[in-house]
Amino acid sequence: MIILAALLAYILGSVPFGYLTSKYLWGVDITKKGSGNIGATNVYRNLGPYPGAITAIGDVGKGMLAVYIGSLLAGERGALVASFFVVIGHAYSIFLKFHGGKIVATTFGVLIMTSIKVTVVVFFIWLTVMLISRYVSLGSIVCGLSIPLIMLLFGLDLSYIYLGIFLAVMIFYRHRDNIKRLRSGTENKIGTRKNG
């Protein structure tokens, strides 16, 4: 059942809500707009708040659902395995030739099902950094790197600390282009509509 939990989580994570929302509700191929990313930030910057919100809700929701299904299939171990694979699916979607999003929204879905306390603190870090710097990407990177530390602070089991480290590394890696733009001073701030 662990293998089934992993497989279902990967498939669910692969569902590209940003692409589907943009393509079939707004008639736009989001992979050809802005940064080409399927995440909520790029959708918002190119199509507006409603498509962005739908994308974010879908990406958070699939993270939550994958963990829930994993727990039904194989208890806590199933939930933990699903947490890894739903994020991998979102980053490397089988439906988009193994391209995907930057995993932040799906990570929040996983965190909601793991620990509300951790979720609230990580979200506060993301929001604070984003509002102060006006860079969504910087907020995402900093909150991602904080995940294992916040999990450790709240005394989560070692297996979840490993999950937190994995999420931190993945978020950092998926934002490598943003990091280059931040360093060069070309990253878009809140209110601009080019890179996502």
UniProtKB/Swiss-Prot annotation:
The keyword DNA-binding does not apply. Pfam families: G3P_acyltransf (PF02660). It is a multi-pass membrane protein. Its EC number is 2.3.1.275. Pathway: Lipid metabolism; phospholipid metabolism. It catalyses: an acyl phosphate + sn-glycerol 3-phosphate = a 1-acyl-sn-glycero-3-phosphate + phosphate. The chain crosses the membrane at residues 1-21, 53-73, 78-98, 112-132, 152-172. Keywords: Cell membrane, Lipid biosynthesis, Lipid metabolism, Membrane, Phospholipid biosynthesis, Phospholipid metabolism, Transferase, Transmembrane, Transmembrane helix. Signal peptide: none annotated. One of its GO terms (biological process) is phospholipid biosynthetic process. InterPro entries: G3P_acylTferase_PlsY (IPR003811). It comes from the Bacteria. One of its GO terms (molecular function) is acyl-phosphate glycerol-3-phosphate acyltransferase activity. GO terms for cellular component: plasma membrane. NCBIfam families: glycerol-3-phosphate 1-O-acyltransferase PlsY. Catalyzes the transfer of an acyl group from acyl-phosphate (acyl-PO(4)) to glycerol-3-phosphate (G3P) to form lysophosphatidic acid (LPA). This enzyme utilizes acyl-phosphate as fatty acyl donor, but not acyl-CoA or acyl-ACP. PANTHER family: GLYCEROL-3-PHOSPHATE ACYLTRANSFERASE-RELATED, INNER MEMBRANE PROTEIN YGIH. This is Glycerol-3-phosphate acyltransferase. It comes from Carboxydothermus hydrogenoformans (strain ATCC BAA-161 / DSM 6008 / Z-2901). The lineage of its organism: Bacteria, Bacillati, Bacillota, Clostridia, Thermoanaerobacterales. The gene is plsY.
